[in-house]
Amino acid sequence: MIGVVLAGGKSSRFGGEKLLYKINGKPLILHTIERVLNAKKIEEIVIVTSKEKMKSFEKLGFSVVVDKLKIGPIGGVYTAISHFADVFVVAGDMPLINPKFVDWIVEKFHESNTLVCVPKWKNGYLEPLHAAYSQDFLEMIKRQIEKGEYMLGKAIRASSPCYIKIESLPLEWQESLFNINAKSDLKKIKGALQV
């Protein structure tokens, strides 16, 4: 399966391009990419980003695809599945992603034969940027975008997805879902990331 790393966000709360911010000498996004590549079910990595950021991310040595829609995560997922078959999508700011958890989600996705397999919190909140998507989900997203509705969660819920109950997962897998929004979040992860 292709691992797609979304890198199109504005980083407004971070105060600069957070995905290129160096942690232990490596850009934040590279920590995420390396962990996803350690998953046995992931064959290659593709970065989906805006045209403006494309050159910065190409320097990392991975394939880059431009998200021309610029409508947030739903546009990134649409771009990914319009270029590739089934994909595992992750946000570039999730450096604690656990490779075994990625493999487990991909297995559940294949077993469930659904369009999407997504982690879900007890309160109903979804983690759509840590999920597996079928290329067959493209039409559902396309219809929603054409209606001017850009909430990825709405399209996922309408697809009768495979849900993964987050609270029942091992703690280290739950930590996979932690993302960096502000510089203060860096303190929480520096010890967990190896040089």
Curated annotation (Swiss-Prot):
Enzyme Commission identifier(s): 2.7.7.77
GO molecular function: GTP binding; metal ion binding; molybdenum cofactor guanylyltransferase activity
Disulfide bridge positions per record: none
Membrane-spanning parts: none
A Gene Ontology biological process term: Mo-molybdopterin cofactor biosynthetic process
Keywords recorded for this protein, A-Z: Cytoplasm, GTP-binding, Magnesium, Metal-binding, Molybdenum cofactor biosynthesis, Nucleotide-binding, Transferase
Pfam families noted in UniProt: NTP_transf_3
Summary of the function given for this chain in its UniProt record: Transfers a GMP moiety from GTP to Mo-molybdopterin (Mo-MPT) cofactor (Moco or molybdenum cofactor) to form Mo-molybdopterin guanine dinucleotide (Mo-MGD) cofactor.
Family stated for the protein in its record: Belongs to the MobA family.
Domain notes: The N-terminal domain determines nucleotide recognition and specific binding, while the C-terminal domain determines the specific binding to the target protein.
Protein name per its UniProtKB record: Probable molybdenum cofactor guanylyltransferase
Gene: mobA
